[in-house]
Amino acid sequence: MSIRFWVVAVLALCCASAAVAEPNAHELWVNVGGFSSHFNSSKNYNENNAGIGVEYRVSPQTSVMAGSYYNSIRHTTTYAAVNWQPYLLGNVKMGVALGMMDGYPSIVRGGTFFAALPLVTYEGKKLGVNLGIIPDMAKVNGAFVVQFKFRVY
């Protein structure tokens, strides 16, 4: 993992926390698992993306997240992102996760790259789920992704 990845990740987390923190909005979640369903199912992707991460909600619309998982092409991916979800409908939040990740050899030879992921989140009192869509792009086959989360604070 490159130093640049961690510098960008820490700066993003600090800036997001300072810019949008609101009283009584702080929650800590542990994100586990991960499943994907690829639009192109003929490529024999791994769709059981085991992993673990943390997500810290700094406001009703914003959280920061970091973690690691076994990706669809059977490499380990590490990520750090700011999750901005300005659209709220009860316990459902909609928006985008913006961050850095690695572990995909077809993109910058497996190095660190910027990613944006449309994200819908449901959060109950103790359990939640993140639902994302990875769009089809040049070297990326799109997929639906699911990540489960447990509130610890």
PLM feature spans:
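Outer-membrane beta-barrel "beta-signal"
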Residues: 30, 34-38, 141-153
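Outer-envelope beta-barrel architecture signal
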Residues: 24-28, 60-62, 76, 90-94, ...
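Outer-membrane beta-barrel proteins
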Residues: 17, 21-22, 58-60, 83-89, ...
